[in-house]
Amino acid sequence: VTKGSVSKWEKNISKPDLQTIPVLATFFGVTIDELLGYLPQLSKDQIQKLYLDYSNSFAVSDFDKTVEDIRTTVKHYYSCYPLVFQMCVLLLNHYLLAKTQKLQTELLHYMSDLCDHIIAHCADLNLCKDTLILKALILMGGGQYKEALQILEADSDPRTLSRESDSVLVSAYLMNGDREKACDFAQITMYLNLFSLVELSAKYLTVAASDQNAFDMTVERVESLIDSYQLVKLNANAVSVFEYQAALGYLQFDDPDAALTHTRKYLDGIRTLLSDEEYRLHGDRYFNRIDHWIEQLANGSVSPRARKTFVKDIAASLSHPLFEKLKDDNTFRRLQNQLKEMIE
């Protein structure tokens, strides 16, 4: 290799011959990727930044342009499976913003293909398991419920011993003298299970829509849980979803007073959710060992969607057809005005 050749490379006049590149990499003791300045794997912080940048872009920029940018990033880092996974999560949270049903369907197929790519090539078993769940959500978005069930039922049998793994791990930590690890893991698991119960209960309210006794008992028990653990302060989004579903249910049961009560509680949760410009998950005085774990999540403590994006959904929430039953109620009108003030 002559000095003249190197000079031309440095000035971008010409490129090294392909056969020369591995020789140069060996000479300098680096990989070919390092020699070319190509980084096929991104760090957690880099992935998080890309996610947040694109999430904000969905809120303020052209949808099609943002999707094209995401596709370009995925092509460039196709073997960075955590990045590909997060881009699927991002698209799943925003694909309904596409202007036509055809574009939405195309995005669902694209996400499904990316999930298949991760599952086929990634060596990280935990990421592959998460990708299977993500693929099931994508299939459900496209109305492929039977296919989603085939994925989910295989991993959700309540009879399996794996359901006991959390408590067994805490016991193992204690027996090994790792009290700090036992405490950390117990808190994290309790926190996750609490919100899993609240979220599943919101789903159960839709199942119990024909059984008011079961509906009432579910609301009563979950409300007690919300109050005891001060869950509105911990995760206002999960609580708001539950209260909203309770309000809709009581409208179906023609109980306007109960519906208004839970609509008010729904707005209390929304007010907490919107109180900060960038709502973040966090612990409290009781869950005082989980903040570090939250920051280690793929997207840290921040919301998976930009504020402007989910505010649009909130703005339309009291326009559900069931709320027509309350359109002449003065209390409901005041609640509508409160919602408008919150999102302006």
Model feature map: region roles:
Residues 19-34:
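DNA major-groove recognition helix of helix-turn-helix/homeodomain DNA-binding modules
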